[in-house]
Amino acid sequence: MVSLEQYLLQSLNMALGSLIQGETSYTNSFNIKIREDGFIFVPRLPCSYILDDELYNEIFLIANASLYPQYTLLKQNATYFIPLNGNDIHVQRGLFFPWRKGISERLVVSDLEEFTRTLGEDSIPIMKNLKINLNKLNHMAICGNSGSGKSYALTYFLSVLKQLSELIIVDPKFDTPSRWARENDISVIHPMENRSKSDFVSEINEKLSQALHIIQKRQAILYENPRYQFDHLTIVIDEVLALSEGVNKAIKEAFFALLFQIALLGRATRVHLLLVSQRFDHTTIPVSVREQLNVLIQIGNINKKTTQFLFPDLDPEGIVIPIGHGTGLIQIIDNEHPYQVLPLLCPTYYTKKGIL
């Protein structure tokens, strides 16, 4: 049986071709080293090819397809050089390609209510081999075009967060989140036919202002006792884009200012934002708020255009996106997960009638 190292070396020898001027491992031009967390492409310098982003991406495309489904290569935004041990200057550096063992697998939940009751403390399962620790969560965004499965994914997160956090829910569409909240006896801020949109956003601003006041009180407690553990508070806003368009300028600016302050100050005080929108450009939320998000989910059609706001530096070419409803990309920026973007399959679950 061919070893993984030999298999990968053969794949690169056959596919790189003209990009490296016909040089191969057979002419001792490069080699491969396998590590637990990835593999290293070791060029023997000087060489006739350039070690640049084009070569790095080409190796990624070849290796990612070759290693699937045993490994998932993690896409880098730029060439990843690492130093190698040894005194021979010809082979003292390599191009590193990090990976995760296996592929993304969808979590299937037969009874959502029972499932959420048995969850571990502060744990949010995303896929079979991926969980988020709520204590490491700053703020979260779910993005996707209409019909991509955002509401279905949001209902799952609401059901899980109900067990772990106090919830404030804003539902501009008066749709799925409102029905879920009705079934779970949680109040929702939603539009009413006898009120203007500016009045509706003003009510939201009032609620955000109360949350900011909670943050300030908690900061004072942390000043005296830095180890104090607060209960989580999560502010869930569905269709943020619907709130930021077509409202009075002063009210919109107040909304953005409150979002920014909560995003900036909420982390240490366990006050989180969960924002859902069809897009996250500067007209939806301020860029300064987007920069505070550390769990980013893009569902639906994945290309450079759809990922430009949540993942501005990412070229999704070569990433194996699963087929089906509720699939896309996820990035978790903390000290427990690889910071690179991963293929995502949102959980499939069964819940009470009349919510979805």
Regions found by a protein language model. Give the residues of each.
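Conserved P-loop NTPase motor module
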Residues: 1-15, 22, 26-43, 292-297, ...
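Interdomain "pre-motor" coupling segment immediately N-terminal to P-loop NTPase/helicase cores
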Residues: 47-107
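Conserved ATP-driven motor cores of ASCE-family P-loop NTPases powering translocation/secretion/packaging/pilus
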Residues: 60-61, 277-354
